[in-house]
């Protein structure tokens, strides 16, 4: 997977989840916050990151920095995905299916954020198993990373893209 320079892209970020974490110590409770953020350029590049800090804005900033370092390129066919795929992470499984133009993003919270920021306008998804936002985002990314475009499939099979379409 090639490195994608975030400085070259016009990235937008979206906070998917903020969790309050409490650690009970001898003197009482210690509060921290964990943030899950997805960044993307609406043009096939998307990344996610998590950050933890004493304050919410600092946790979000750390998550955005982590997300910018974790960018992937998503293959697209027009406004949708090239083929159906199932992504897995921990107890979460996400099924992503291409949809006809104009159908929109039929996906829940965390998956919707990833798809919209990746620039995928038409997709259907189904979440199977765990619905924890972090696991759902990681499963979605697993599916997107395992997605193949027509050129790579044709190269693997040793045929032309036109022959593959027949």
From Swiss-Prot:
Q: Name one GO biological process term.
A: translation
Q: Which residues form the S5 DRBM domain?
A: 11-74
Which InterPro entries has this protein been placed in? Ribosomal_Su5_D2-typ_SF, Ribosomal_uS5, Ribosomal_uS5_bac-type, Ribosomal_uS5_C, Ribosomal_uS5_N, Ribosomal_uS5_N_CS, Ribsml_uS5_D2-typ_fold_subgr
Gene Ontology, cellular component aspect: small ribosomal subunit
Record's keyword terms, sorted: Ribonucleoprotein, Ribosomal protein, RNA-binding, rRNA-binding
> Which Pfam families does the annotation name?
Ribosomal_S5, Ribosomal_S5_C
Q: What GO annotations for molecular function exist for this entry? A: rRNA binding; structural constituent of ribosome
Domain free text: The N-terminal domain interacts with the head of the 30S subunit; the C-terminal domain interacts with the body and contacts protein S4. The interaction surface between S4 and S5 is involved in control of translational fidelity.
Record family assignment? Belongs to the universal ribosomal protein uS5 family.
Q: Outline the subunit composition.
A: Part of the 30S ribosomal subunit. Contacts proteins S4 and S8.
From the Swiss-Prot or TrEMBL record, give the protein name. Small ribosomal subunit protein uS5
**What gene name does this entry carry?**
rpsE
């Amino acid at each position: 997977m090639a490195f994608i320079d975030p400085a070259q892209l016009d990235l937008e970020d979206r906070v998917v989840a903020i969790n309050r974490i409490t650690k009970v110590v001898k003197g009482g409770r210690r509060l921290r916050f964990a943030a899950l953020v997805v960044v993307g350029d609406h043009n096939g590049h998307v990344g996610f990151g998590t950050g933890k800090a004493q304050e919410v804005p600092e946790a979000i900033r750390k998550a955005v920095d982590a997300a910018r370092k974790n960018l992937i390129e998503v293959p697209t066919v027009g406004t949708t995905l090239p083929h159906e795929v199932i992504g897995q992470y921990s107890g979460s499984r996400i099924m992503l299916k291409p949809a006809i133009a104009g159908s929109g993003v039929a996906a829940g919270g965390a998956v919707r954020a990833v798809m919209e920021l990746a620039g995928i306008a038409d997709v259907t998804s189904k979440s199977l198993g765990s619905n924890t936002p972090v696991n759902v985002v990681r499963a979605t990314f697993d599916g997107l990373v395992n997605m193949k475009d027509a050129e790579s499939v044709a190269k693997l099979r040793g045929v032309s893209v036109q022959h593959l379409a027949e």
